[in-house]
Amino acid sequence: MHNHPRHEGHLHTVNVKYGYVVFLLSIVHIVVVATVPRLRKVGSSSTRRSLPWLPQIVIWAILLAILGVWNIHEWSEHYNVSIKRFGRMAYCLLPFDILLAYKYWPLENYLQNLNLHKWMSRIIVVCSMIHGIGYFVKWFVEGTFFHHLFKIDNLLGVVVFAAAVVLLVVSVALFRRQSYRLFYVSHNITIGMFVVLILFHARPPVTLFVAICGLLLAILFFIKFQTYSATPVSLKEVPNSSLVLVSFPWPDHIATSFKPGSHVRINHSNRSWKSWVFASHPFTSATLPGTSETLDLVVKKGTFIFAKDTQYNLSSPYTSLSFDDNSISRFDQSVIICGGSGISLAIPVFKYLITKLDVTMIWCTRSKADLFVLRHYSLLDKVQVYITGNDSLSVEDESEGHGLMHETIELENLEESSKNSEATKQPEILRGRPDLNNVCASLETTPNSSCVISCGPRSLVKDCENWCRNHKIESVTEIYEM
């Protein structure tokens, strides 16, 4: 790849072993993440839980910080060895980070792995920035900045460095939520540049890791297009509602794979350039085979535009939460609290749990017009509804209920005819936000056999998580956001 080595002597190759150390540690990490939840399940009827992602990130940050400066003598003379090492360690972590982005693999909770992927990516970017900024400072101090900068192999590294900085900025939650597409495109471009350009930049070469990354990305790309095509059989919406009920035919070859809480990813047809450039969108199936003739999605208007007589690509189902007889066997009662389009996960889970234990379902939504969803599934008299907006709510709000659980509207009954609601199959409708101490009060008498399932916007889920933490009650959560 290079006509002659840039550096002579043992210092040129001293960092190679550290790259292999980091790679081997990442393999150990994969094995641990894959096996620990299964070991926890052996001999226990408790819910299988993934390892918390935050301690894993902290451990990696500490390990890399130690390895980055390990065994460097005469620091003032050989500090450049540390600078080079951070760059190599960053690249050798890339296969692990790519693997964490897989949606179909045996490492348990996909959404939990997504958090790990997000923060591992940031660690890789930080290590790369230490490498890049370190060399910028070195060249500037030596007075050789422009001499080194415009050498082709160095310039390729600078290009990757610039892309990584841009990615770090657009990955911040504020920017990512405002324009997920910009983040997604930037992310893919940066990964592609990282994998390819570093092949020509790194000294000594990282050919093995380039090959591994290339293989993993090729598999990921192949999986992305392992979809089936389907056309909506119906689109149901009502005036003033922010929700749309979209129905697809069940895919014959994978219909039995759907479980309560299963998700599918939907994208435009392969004939559209959008399917090649933009990310597919995750949706939760509100129905299950055997109980419904169609695969139904409850979609917030504006998140993904569906049109009848238009073909879409649908992925195989995947789950981030496990609801089966074994995982719920230790629970006697549960409260399901959902917000907005989070009703799509709550409906099949509620229908499954209601035959197993004492379960209450609460739905926080912006408008009474959204109740057509409950009416469609004959759940009007089985759900407590909290209206957090008003009937003239604009449906163009992109934030899926930011601050949903922080409204200060005084609680009041909206249904004057609530006393005969059972006869007319009307839900219990209240204005404002639910008081978790009130709606979950029954769980406090048996905290060890109770759980709260929350799904929807981040604010709602975090409120429920905090309440459960304070009352030592198990929390099962899913946040609805890209």
UniProtKB/Swiss-Prot annotation:
The lineage of its organism: Eukaryota, Fungi, Dikarya, Ascomycota, Saccharomycotina. The gene is AIM14. This is Probable metalloreductase AIM14. It comes from Meyerozyma guilliermondii (strain ATCC 6260 / CBS 566 / DSM 6381 / JCM 1539 / NBRC 10279 / NRRL Y-324) (Yeast). It comes from the Eukaryota. The keyword GTP-binding does not apply. Residues 225-348 form the FAD-binding FR-type domain. Residues 86-198 form the Ferric oxidoreductase domain. The keyword Lipid metabolism does not apply. Belongs to the ferric reductase (FRE) family. AIM14 subfamily. Its EC number is 1.16.1.-. It is a multi-pass membrane protein.
